[in-house]
Amino acid sequence: MAKRQLLMLGIRTSFHTIAAVLVAGLIFTAVFLSRNSLPKENPQSHGVTDRGGDSGRECNLFEGKWVFDNVSYPLYKEEDCKFMSDQLACEKFGRKDLSYKFWRWQPHTCDLPRFNGTKLLERLRNKRMVYVGDSLNRGQWVSMVCMVSSVITNPKAMYMHNNGSNLITFKALEYNATIDYYWAPLLVESNSDDPTNHRFPDRIVRIQSIEKHARHWTNSDIIVFNSYLWWRMPHIKSLWGSFEKLDGIYKEVEMVRVYEMALQTLSQWLEVHVNPNITKLFFMSMSPTHERAEEWGGILNQNCYGEASLIDKEGYTGRGSDPKMMRVLENVLDGLKNRGLNMQMINITQLSEYRKEGHPSIYRKQWGTVKENEISNPSSNADCIHWCLPGVPDVWNELLYAYILDHHSS
């Protein structure tokens, strides 16, 4: 009898154990399936609000079209921004066709978040944001300063400091928010580092030296890099040594290779000095030029001078951008991410390709005496590199704003 009771007890115990295991398995399976039924976040996604009705569909902020919008644009008035650069103030210097101010970027399947200067300043409260790079990045910095200063009603609550060095500072006092620009056109140390005296026939870089510049970015909360146009020559001299001493070793290196080396030097510095939990990193892709009108069906040997319309061919690419350099940048950023540090590329290249009419052309301050041939042939003096403000760089900053405020996730 006792043996039979023990046997029955063992059977019941085994049954309960098996049942418990089965229940646990069912619970685990249900949780696993429910987790995997959720939409997965793609780290490369550029999505915001999907307008297509399919919530699982990703949106790329950088694929879209320009829409004329003279109701909500421009985001500020050229004459109202006391920080405007004369190099970019096209209306002030005589441009009559002002339609370049009224174009809004519309992604194909979503909406770009509307820029809100107050929200950005709140996000930047007690923080520092710095743009690092060449004059294109300086133009984007001017754009951002104009965009945020337009919501500050007290002119005494903001100021700009420029003592002629590489660093220019904008401060919004009420928020203790700093938005800086730092001149470093090749990112690493070079013979073009002087903010005013930087044009030489030979471009020379110290490819492994970046600390001279980088110490000015340390402890920033947001860093926005760019570097493109200053590399555009077949070969660049690389210096092993210092500019002060005469015993340095110079070697001409193919441009794409030395560009990659500079980006790797930047990456190595960031890995050592940047806390990814504190600092957000961005890299603006290349800003295209429009110096050959024949590329978009215009007159041979002409450029952006006199252009008043956009390029309407979707996917248009001219020779003012370099796919090889773009691939190098993407590969370096991918490698950096694989090592645990994310630097988001803001891909402004394709959307800017369409805007051949957005450059200053001849409508800017002339820093020297205008030559006779430039008067008779204005296109020879046209700036088809930089951008009028308000204009294209405002959209670059709207894209940047979406990432800073994390309004880019699906």
From Swiss-Prot:
One of its GO terms (molecular function) is xylan O-acetyltransferase activity. Pfam families: PC-Esterase, PMR5N. The chain crosses the membrane at residues 13-33. The keyword DNA damage does not apply. It is found in: Golgi apparatus membrane. InterPro entries: TBL, TBL_C, TBL_N. It is a single-pass type II membrane protein. A motif (DCXHWCLPGXXDXWN motif) lies at residues 383-397. GO terms for cellular component: Golgi apparatus; Golgi membrane. Keywords: Golgi apparatus, Membrane, Signal-anchor, Transmembrane, Transmembrane helix. GO terms for biological process: xylan biosynthetic process. Contains 2 motifs that are conserved in esterases, but it is unlikely that this protein belongs to the catalytically active pectin esterases. This is Protein trichome birefringence-like 34. The lineage of its organism: Eukaryota, Viridiplantae, Streptophyta, Embryophyta, Tracheophyta. The gene is TBL34.
